[in-house]
Regions:
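Glycine-rich beta-alpha loop elements in corrinoid/cobalamin-binding modules
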Residues: 1-35, 251-253, 257
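Radical SAM enzyme core and accessory elements
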Residues: 22-23, 60, 259-265, 269-336
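Short aromatic-enriched loop/helix-cap "lid" or pocket-rim segments at secondary-structure transitions
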Residues: 30-31, 40, 133, 161-162, ...
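Mobile, glycine-enriched helix-loop/loop "lid" segments at the mouths of ligand-binding/catalytic clefts
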Residues: 33-53, 262-280
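Radical SAM [4Fe-4S] cluster-binding motif and immediate context
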Residues: 45-217, 237
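Flexible glycine/acidic-rich beta-alpha junction loops that bind and position SAM and/or redox cofactors
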Residues: 80, 130-131, 187-192, 222-230, ...
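Catalytic cores of alpha/beta
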Residues: 165, 226-240
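Bilobed periplasmic-binding protein-like "clamshell/Venus-flytrap" ligand-binding domains
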Residues: 217, 244-251, 309-316
Length: 336
C-alpha cells in the first residue's frame, strides 16, 4: 500500500482495500481466502515487545495459569451461519487446519525463545475436526504446558465421542474449555441466531467436560433483536443451572458484515438512530424491557457479578484456583 501511494500506482488492485466513495464504502478487491494454512509464516513475535506484553498481562483468558502466554491459531474458517458472527466473512466457511507439524514448530520455537508458560488457542472451531485435534493433543502432551480455549468452541460437536475427546484434551494439558452457548431458549437459537444448537445438548456437554477434569467457562449473549425480557431471564436461569464453573454474559454487538448488522439497519434498531462505536461493553441497539442503553449495561454488569460469584458459593477451592485468593467483586467484573 505504501509503495503504491509513493509511486502513484493504482491502489484499487491491492487485495482487501476498502475505498471510500462519497458517504459509502466499497470493497474494491476482495482478498483471496488462504486455503493452505501451512504457507503462513511463523508470526514475527521478535518484532514485538513481548516482555511488555507479558507485564501487561491482559491475555484472552482472564485468569491464566502463567504470566507468559502464547496465543495461537491452528485453523481458520467456520461452516456455521450464526447471524451475529463475521468469522465466515473474514476467514470463509470452509474449515481449514494447519498441519500438526506446522503448529508444533511455532509452539516449540516460541516456548524456547520467550519462555512461554501457557498456550491459549484462539480458534473459532478448535473442536470442529476431531482427527486433527487428537493429533495435536498427542504432541501437546509431550510439551507439558497448560492450555485453554478462551475463544469458545461449539457445544455439540462430536457428541458420541465428546467425552473421549475432552479426556484427550485434558490429558494434553487443557485446564479449561470455553463453550459458546449464547442462549438457553431454543427459539433464539433457531429463529434469531441460526445457531444449529439443540439447547438440550448444552448441559451434557458441560457435564462431559467436567467429567474429563476441565474447568468450564460459558459464553452467553443477551439483547438479540426480537428477544424478549422474559427470554433473557430464561437464558440467565438456564445458565445458572448449567453446572458451568464461570460465565460471560455479553451484550449483543451488531458486527459490520453480519446478518444481524443488516437487520439492525433495515429495521432502525439503534438506540439513537445511528451506529455508534463498539467496544463490546456498550449497548447499541434497543432491548425489550429497558429504556436506555445505560440501564441494560447495568443489568449485564450485575448479571455477570451474580453468575461468577456462584462458583465461590458452590466450590471455594475452584474459585480460588480460577480467580486467586484476593479477588473482589469489582476486580472480578474487570475480567468478565
Amino acid at each position: 500500500f505504501v509503495n503504491s501511494i509513493v509511486n502513484n500506482n493504482d491502489v484499487s488492485k491491492i487485495p482487501g482495500l476498502i475505498k471510500k466513495i462519497g458517504e459509502k464504502k466499497y470493497l474494491i478487491n476482495p482478498p483471496e481466502i488462504v486455503k493452505d494454512l501451512n504457507v503462513l509464516p511463523r508470526p514475527p513475535r521478535h518484532l514485538v515487545n513481548m516482555e511488555g506484553y507479558f507485564d501487561i498481562g491482559q491475555f484472552h483468558s482472564s485468569k491464566s495459569r502463567s504470566n507468559r502466554v502464547l496465543n495461537i491459531m491452528c485453523s481458520r474458517g467456520c461452516p456455521e451461519k450464526c447471524t451475529f458472527c463475521t468469522t465466515p466473512e473474514v476467514y470463509g466457511q470452509t474449515h481449514r487446519w494447519r498441519s500438526t507439524a506446522h503448529i508444533m514448530e511455532e509452539i516449540k520455537n516460541d516456548v524456547r525463545d520467550f519462555k512461554i508458560g501457557e498456550l491459549q488457542f484462539d480458534d473459532d472451531t478448535l473442536t470442529g475436526n476431531r482427527k486433527n485435534l487428537m493429533s495435536l493433543c498427542k504432541e501437546l502432551e509431550k510439551v507439558g504446558l497448560p492450555w485453554c480455549t478462551p475463544n469458545g468452541t461449539k457445544v455439540n460437536y462430536h457428541l458420541k465421542h465428546q467425552l473421549d475427546m475432552y479426556k484427550s484434551m485434558a490429558a494434553a494439558g487443557c485446564y479449561q474449555i470455553t463453550l459458546a452457548c449464547e442462549s438457553g431458549v431454543q427459539r433464539i437459537l433457531d429463529d434469531v441466531i441460526n445457531k444449529r444448537l439443540p439447547a438440550d445438548t448444552i448441559y451434557p456437554s458441560i457435564e462431559n467436560a467436567k467429567k474429563a477434569g476441565m474447568l468450564v467457562h460459558t459464553f452467553w449473549i443477551l439483547g438479540f433483536p426480537g428477544e424478549t425480557y422474559e427470554e433473557m431471564q430464561r437464558t440467565i436461569k438456564f445458565a445458572f443451572n448449567s453446572g458451568s464453573d464461570s460465565f460471560t454474559f455479553s451484550i449483543l454487538q451488531p458486527l459490520a458484515g453480519s446478518p444481524i448488522y443488516r437487520q439492525v439497519w433495515r429495521n432502525n434498531l439503534w438506540w439513537d438512530a445511528k451506529e455508534s462505536y463498539q467496544n463490546f461493553r456498550n449497548s447499541l441497539i434497543k432491548v425489550d424491557g429497558f429504556s436506555s442503553p445505560e440501564e441494560f449495561e447495568r443489568f449485564i454488569h450485575e448479571t455477570n457479578i451474580k453468575a461468577n460469584l456462584l462458583l465461590k458459593e458452590k466450590d471455594p477451592d475452584k474459585f480460588r484456583l480460577k480467580y486467586g485468593d484476593r479477588v473482589s467483586q469489582s476486580s472480578l467484573m474487570k475480567q468478565t
